[in-house]
Structures are given as C-alpha cells and as structure tokens.
Amino acid sequence: MRHQWVANRRGQSNVSQMHYARQGQITEEMDYVAKRENLPADLIREEVARGRMIIPANVNHVNLEPMAIGIASKCKVNANIGASPNSSNIEEELDKLRLAVKYGADTVMDLSTGGGNLDEIRTAIINESSVPIGTVPIYQALESVHGNIENLTADDFLHIIDKHAQQGVDYQTIHAGILIEHLPLVRDRITGIVSRGGGILARWMLHHHKQNPLYTRFNDVIEIFKKHDVSFSLGDSLRPGCTHDASDDAQLAELKTLGQLTRRAWEHDVQVMVEGPGHVPMDQIEFNVRKQMEECSEAPFYVLGPLVTDIAPGYDHITSAIGAAMAGWYGTAMLCYVTPKEHLGLPDAEDVRNGLIAYKIAAHAADIARHRPGARDRDDQLSEARYNFDWNRQFELSLDPERAREYHDETLPADIYKTAEFCSMCGPKFCPMQTKVDADALTELEKFLAKDQVGSAR
C-alpha cells in the first residue's frame, strides 16, 4: 500500500517520519495512523515531532500497514519469533509470524540466530508481514565471524545494520548504551548480564579494553537510519535478569546513557524508543517507568514483561503479564510478550499464541485503566452479549474466539446450547443472569421504598 507514498520521497537525505513531522508535514503514514487510533492527524504529527511517538515504517517495507507506538496511542504488543541453530526453519517462522498477526501482534521481532540463511529468513518475514518488523543486528554480526566475539569490528556491526535497513527492517535494537565503565557495576548481581546483545558487547569490551563500538560509532548508525527511516529501539543491555537485580546501579547508569543517545538521535530527526526491563518487583514498576520518562525525555518505553517473580518457569507468560499490565497503566507504550517457554526453550506456535493473548489482555487492561477513549467498548459489548446469553457473539468478541468456543464445546457441544440460557458451570437452574430485572418492577419498587421511607420518618 506504500509504494507511491515512498516513491515520492526518493532522493531525499532524511526520510524519517520525525523529519517530516518537524517540518509540519502530515505524511500518509501519519494520516493512516490517525484513522487507526481514532485521533486527530495533527496530534499524531505533534507527538512524532516531539519524540513521544514513533511510526516504525522503513521506506523499503512497502506492504506495511503503518502503526504508532507512544503514550498517546493504544498500548501495543510485540511478539518475538526467530530460528535458532538447533530448531526451526523459514516455513516454521512464517507460520509463527502469521499466527502472531492473527492473535493481535502489533509488531514482530525476528530474533533468528541460526536455522538457515539469516538473510533469507529475514527477507521472507518482511515480505510476508503487514506489521513492523524489528531485529537485533548484533546476532548476525556475531554469526558473520563464526561466533568469535573478539574478531568483531565496528565495521562488522555497521555492515549488518545497513544490510537490515536496506532489507526493510522497521526498527533495530541497538545496544549502544552499555559502556565499559558500567561493567564493574554488575559485580554484585545474582544473574549478571542477561541480554544476549549486552553479553556479546561486554565480552568484546573486556577482551579489547575499548569502549563499546556501537556507542563510539553511534552517529554512523544515525546516518544509516535516517536514509531508510529505521527507528532506534535502544537496547537495555544491563536490564535485570531477576528481581534481586532490579533498579540497581548498573541498570540506571545505562538508562542515563540511553537518554543521552535518544537526544542525539533526535538532533538528526531519527525516531527512538527505549527498551526496558526485565524482572521487576511490583512495587518498583512505577519507579522504573517514571525514571525512563525522566531520563529519556518521554521517548516511548518498550518493556520485556516485566516478570514480577522468578519462581514460575513454564508460567512466565503469567508472571510477566502481571508486570506488563502495571507498566502499561503507568505509561509504557509497548509490551514485549513473554511465552510459557521463557527461560526453558524456543517457543512453538502454541506458545506464541498463549504469550500473545496474555499480553493482549495486559495491554487492553492498561488502556482501560488509562481511560483511553473507546477502550472499554468491546468489554461492554461482550458483557451485554453474556447477559443476553448470546454465546456466538461472546465468542466473536473474545480476544481468542477459537479458545472460548473450544472450552464451551467441551461440555455443551451441540448447537442447541449456543442459545441456551446457562453454561456447564451453573447449569439450567442456578445461573444468576437468568434473573432479569424488569424496569417496570424496579419503578414499582422505588415507589414502595419511597413510601416506606416516608412512613419510617413519621
């Protein structure tokens, strides 16, 4: 749908949405987002210009349906997919992509580290996807030197970053905030550095005793991004990997650097969102969101979870959705889903489904809590259908219609039960929703109560 839109921008040195927004121009992407969000187009332009909203939309991803990530828009959900050296292939990843989009992923990150030709996998995903695609280019940079971290150079990183930009990746996680002086701060952690990208750079800095090359060459990354309109997703290399490590000096030192990098990118009209933790106890979530807004000048916050406890392997889509709902309520713009396989293995299609639904619930709950216009409309419609025993309408309005119908069918599969005024929980005689309160009866009751109060007053 974007062929003509981007064709009109050919030859321009900066094609970022922020660049146009700061020139006072409402692009086709901004107008499209305004309709999707039911917000004024000029508000979208103002938020993008200010840096509080991004529209990740690489000019080379022409089949993209533009969307927004920011505090003024609905809370979004990202799904991670990706092949590994031990599992998965192109077709399996495309199936995961389709499933993720089906169940409401607003963006998808390809975190492939193996399983075939990474360029082919990425190209296939971009060509198939109508939602923005994000990547972590450091993974392919490491693969390009056959896993020998010490052999990586700054040019290796930039080559892969540029390749991803040319292929149409809409946003890239760039781990530029971890500095060599931050490394001693992880000494007292239980889980050290849990970011894969952060771990790679930490080992590189420890080996060479040199500063993070993504930090020293940050302006070169900016130049690549503004040519293709790639958004920064500034990686939190020192995010806490357990609740013990949350909000520590290492995490906050990197966050301060991420704020400085955000403003450097903005000087060149390049869009930025900032990644966040991780594992955070419930009582620290508000602090983390507020601190990010303060340090990063209100750039959109994109958090992984956070998990609020560490004792539930196999159920971390639940432990993290609790934290995600709270983070969304406090103002986080996008939530990165966690699947039941987190910390245990590579998720399959069913894990993707379960993780996504858990996070769509969290994001929707956050939108309701933030009183976004129209956020509760679907809830009210489903409640009306429930009260009227309109089972098919309930299924239709559910986040996962297939699962809702499946559970109802387990005990009452016949079509006749789709109009029944009960379910298998209460049966035909005990359902409280059968007690329909007649409006006329309520009016008569009010008259009686009014008379009774008068009599009591005497």
Curated annotation (Swiss-Prot):
This is Phosphomethylpyrimidine synthase. Zn(2+) binds at H279, H343. The gene is thiC. Pfam families: ThiC_Rad_SAM. Pathway: Cofactor biosynthesis; thiamine diphosphate biosynthesis. Belongs to the ThiC family. Keywords: 4Fe-4S, Iron, Iron-sulfur, Lyase, Metal-binding, S-adenosyl-L-methionine, Thiamine biosynthesis, Zinc. [4Fe-4S] cluster binds at C423, C426, C431. It comes from Acaryochloris marina (strain MBIC 11017). One of its GO terms (molecular function) is zinc ion binding. The keyword Magnesium does not apply. Substrate binds at N80, M109, Y139, H175, S195, R196, G197, D236, S237, L238, R239, E275, Y302. Catalyzes the synthesis of the hydroxymethylpyrimidine phosphate (HMP-P) moiety of thiamine from aminoimidazole ribotide (AIR) in a radical S-adenosyl-L-methionine (SAM)-dependent reaction. Its EC number is 4.1.99.17. It catalyses: 5-amino-1-(5-phospho-beta-D-ribosyl)imidazole + S-adenosyl-L-methionine = 4-amino-2-methyl-5-(phosphooxymethyl)pyrimidine + CO + 5'-deoxyadenosine + formate + L-methionine + 3 H(+). HAMAP family: ThiC. Its cofactor is [4Fe-4S] cluster. The keyword Metal-binding applies. One of its GO terms (biological process) is thiamine diphosphate biosynthetic process. Binds 1 [4Fe-4S] cluster per subunit. The cluster is coordinated with 3 cysteines and an exchangeable S-adenosyl-L-methionine. One of its GO terms (cellular component) is cytosol.
